[in-house]
From Swiss-Prot:
The lineage of its organism: Bacteria, Thermotogati, Deinococcota, Deinococci, Deinococcales. Keywords: Aminoacyl-tRNA synthetase, ATP-binding, Ligase, Metal-binding, Nucleotide-binding, Zinc. A motif ('KMSKS' region) lies at residues 233-237. Pfam families: tRNA-synt_1c (PF00749). ATP binds at K236. The keyword Zinc applies. This is Glutamyl-Q tRNA(Asp) synthetase. GO terms for biological process: glutamyl-tRNA aminoacylation; tRNA modification.
């Protein structure tokens, strides 16, 4: 089987060092296994997209020595998401977030996990006729389990209790992240999804959506997020310095790659020299994979 991986940034601003580290690891994974590597711009939320961010992202990746075999934009694939949505058991929902949280607070149970679980208010068809409607997936009465191929951890979620009916199309017509990423990974032939650990808890619902659409879920590998000196994850919204600052100030890309490698938790990366190329890191990632039978 040919491995296909991907890096899927949102062009809502400039890449920061945390994005660069995830991009590096995704590239190392694809190339260490002799596979294809895709660049996919997740640009469905057009209100937040910045037109200049596409080219800036490409320049930053090329500066680091990271290449890709094919490029995609989600904004050019809307018909595929519409077709997938039509094949799923969904229903209209006119609940606001405030109403959802109020319904949960009034119920006997508390929210499960890190986010509020939709209580099913609109499931019987009781929608507000004067509001635009989102589309929610009526999740099956089933458990969805995912084993992380990197850590070996397994996460199981009972979909109705732990996830709830979740939005696949917003009330403004924008297709939701979970639908688009599942359709894209399946139709692009992505076999291995390496991404940040913040998306670990989303993996069971995405695996369930893969199966509901007749696809085989990919292997998931979740890597630690890069934090600042306060222990907070780097984020565009949090004002993390853009990677382009290092490039524009004449910093050598090899030094940036070495600095990123030194932050990784696996043996060997902390010992790389002060300057290194991306291909020179491939054997180290190969060593990481060799210790994990799931990869």
């Amino acid at each position: 089987m040919t491995v296909t991986g991907r890096f899927a940034p949102s062009p809502t601003g400039a890449m920061h060092l945390g994005n660069a580290r995830t991009a590096l690891l995704a590239w190392l994974h694809s190339r260490a296994l002799g596979g294809r590597h895709l660049l996919r711009f997740e640009d469905l939320d057009t209100g937040r997209v910045r037109g200049w961010a596409y080219d800036l992202t490409r320049r930053d990746l090329e500066w680091l020595g990271l290449d890709w075999d094919e490029e995609f934009r989600q904004s050019e694939r809307l018909d595929l998401y519409a077709a997938a949505l039509a094949g799923l058991d969904t229903y209209p929902c006119t609940c606001t977030r405030k109403e959802v949280l109020a319904a949960i607070a009034d119920s006997a149970g508390a929210p499960h996990g890190e986010e509020a679980v939709y209580p099913g208010t609109c499931r019987p068809g009781s929608v507000h006729p004067e509001r635009p409607a989102a589309r929610r997936w009526r999740v099956p009465e089933a458990e969805s389990c995912v084993t992380d191929a990197l850590s070996g951890d397994t996460l199981c979620q009972w979909l109705p209790r732990d996830v709830g009916d979740f939005v696949l199309q917003r009330n403004d017509g924008v297709y939701a992240y979970h639908l688009a990423v599942v359709v894209d990974d399946a139709l692009m032939g992505v076999t291995d999804v390496l991404r940040g650990a913040d998306l670990w808890t989303a993996s069971p619902r995405q695996a369930a959506l893969h199966r509901a659409l007749g696809f085989t879920p990919p292997r998931f590998l979740h890597v630690p997020l890069l934090s600042n000196y306060r222990g907070e994850r780097l984020a565009k919204r949090g004002g993390a310095p853009p990677l382009s600052e290092w490039r524009e100030h004449g910093e050598a890309p090899g030094r940036v790659l070495a600095d990123l490698a030194h932050t990784l938790p696996w043996p060997g990366f902390q010992a790389v020299p002060e300057e290194v190329t991306a291909p020179e890191l491939l054997p180290l990632w190969g060593d990481v994979l060799a210790e994990r039978p799931g990869t």
